[in-house]
Regions:
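Aromatic-rich carbohydrate-recognition surfaces in CAZymes
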Residues: 1-45, 72-73, 80-83, 87
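Active-site-adjacent bridging/hinge elements
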Residues: 3-10, 49-57, 143-144
Length: 174
């Protein structure tokens, strides 16, 4: 659940934007943002001419070990963008980081909204079979689906426990 790394970075930016605490962002905040950005840069894998983030578990615990989870990829990009902005604004002299961050932002592949207006949760989600969930909706919040299917089986279906892309739209409305 590496998305937590970007979630913390997002919270740091929110704190700074809300409080205007320049001392915090120039010291502790920048240190945290740089290290979390370095983590994302190291997590990316090259696939042909682009970078991708593989083998992740986004906030939706029913979809595990997937590639290019939309929530994770967008939050990772935001983390690296903000770290780069803060580094430039507060005079970070780590030229190697700046170069790596620029390349990451240029080459990271981002899941795109489909013609039907849907942002796929990950590379495989839309190809998975959908099942009728009416039986389980009456017992909402109880995970009764796990009485009929194993977690591994649920992982291979179009089923959400937490709607990653809905939360993504809240956290990064732009």
């Amino acid at each position: 659940e590496h998305h937590l790394v970007a979630d913390i970075a997002w919270a740091v930016i929110q704190y700074w934007q809300t409080t205007g605490d320049e001392s915090f962002i120039a010291h502790e905040g920048m240190a945290l943002l740089l290290e979390t950005a370095k983590f994302w840069i190291s997590r990316a894998v090259r696939v042909n001419d682009r970078l991708e983030i593989h083998d992740v578990i986004g906030p939706d615990e029913y979809t595990e070990h997937v590639n290019n989870n939309a929530y994770t990829s967008y939050m990772a990009r935001y983390n690296v963008q903000q770290a780069l902005n803060i580094a430039r604004q507060f005079g970070c002299s780590d030229d190697a980081f700046i170069h790596r961050a620029e390349m990451f932002l240029k080459e990271l592949w981002m899941p795109e909204i489909q013609p039907d207006g849907v942002l796929p949760q990950d590379d495989s989600f839309m190809a998975k079979p959908a099942i009728n969930l009416a039986k389980y909706k009456a017992a909402a919040g109880k995970q009764t689906i796990l009485l009929d299917y194993s977690r591994a089986e649920v992982n291979e279906m179009q089923i959400l426990k937490q709607a990653d892309v809905v939360m993504l739209n809240y956290m990064l409305p732009e």
